[in-house]
UniProtKB/Swiss-Prot annotation:
Catalyzes the transfer of a dimethylallyl group onto the adenine at position 37 in tRNAs that read codons beginning with uridine, leading to the formation of N6-(dimethylallyl)adenosine (i(6)A). Residues 35-38 are annotated as: Interaction with substrate tRNA. ATP binds at G10, P11, T12, A13, T14, G15, K16, S17. The record marks T101 as: Interaction with substrate tRNA. This is tRNA dimethylallyltransferase. Substrate binds at T12, A13, T14, G15, K16, S17. One of its GO terms (molecular function) is ATP binding. One of its GO terms (biological process) is tRNA modification. Monomer. Its cofactor is Mg(2+). The lineage of its organism: Bacteria, Bacillati, Cyanobacteriota, Cyanophyceae, Acaryochloridales.
Amino acid sequence: MTPGLIVICGPTATGKSSLALALARRLGAPILSADSRQVYRGFDIGTAKPSVTDQEDVPHYLIDICDPTETLTVADYQEQAQALIAQFHTEGQTPILVGGTGLYIRAIVEGLKIPRVPPQLELRSQLQSQGQVQIYQWLQQVDPPAAQKIHAHDQVRTLRALEVFYTTGIPLSAQQGKNPPSYPILQIGLDISDLDQHTDIIQQRTAAMVEQGWLTEVQKLIDHYGVELPLLATLGYQEMKAYLHQQITLEEATAQTILHTRQFAKRQRTWFRANSGIHWFDATNSDLLSLVWKDIQGQPWL
């Protein structure tokens, strides 16, 4: 067997982590997370982070590697992921990269050449004080291609793109060349074609997160890091924070989270479907594991 990389990607709430665990057990493979929020300690329930039991059962990497006040750039993630993949290859292992952060996956699969601009804390503070609406408008002016790929409410990525532009004078979108890896890669995509069914799953998952103590998690993050923590403005956490501050009801917070998750899944679907190299599978197929396993066995390098 030639060491390579198995990628499991696709929209949120399609069972990517469960499939990765099942395959990792069969292959004796480590799992690398490709989730831009699971890298942060304390953001657990709302990011569907693998449980402690699952992490003890199968080695997971690139989870809980940063404090929420720290900045992990795509270049930082890429560097750490590439180092881990190289390490596993020397041990004869093929790791599994799983997640829904498209840029993280592209950084590895396509070998994106990403500008290594250190975080500019003073600049970030100045930009953040202007509010997300204003800074996103600035991004649309200075780097339209980057703005098209970044959601208008994604403050973390908006700040980073502006940071790169104001530090280097060159738009982030103009600095991303490619240097694809030489090892073989199998990309597996999971999706649910029945959007009503996918919505039901998102509703059930959101309700389960609340029952598991998501509100307590958000309150602890607010108490420890402050209400202005940028990560608390991300999907789900923003809505739960609004409820805790008595701005909306829990029913409204849950409904908004479900709606925004559906919208996020749509954007992920568009992103990943543009990649012709992905082998797609129906996440609701009862024979999913067998079908994916057959695909893996059909790869000459595995």
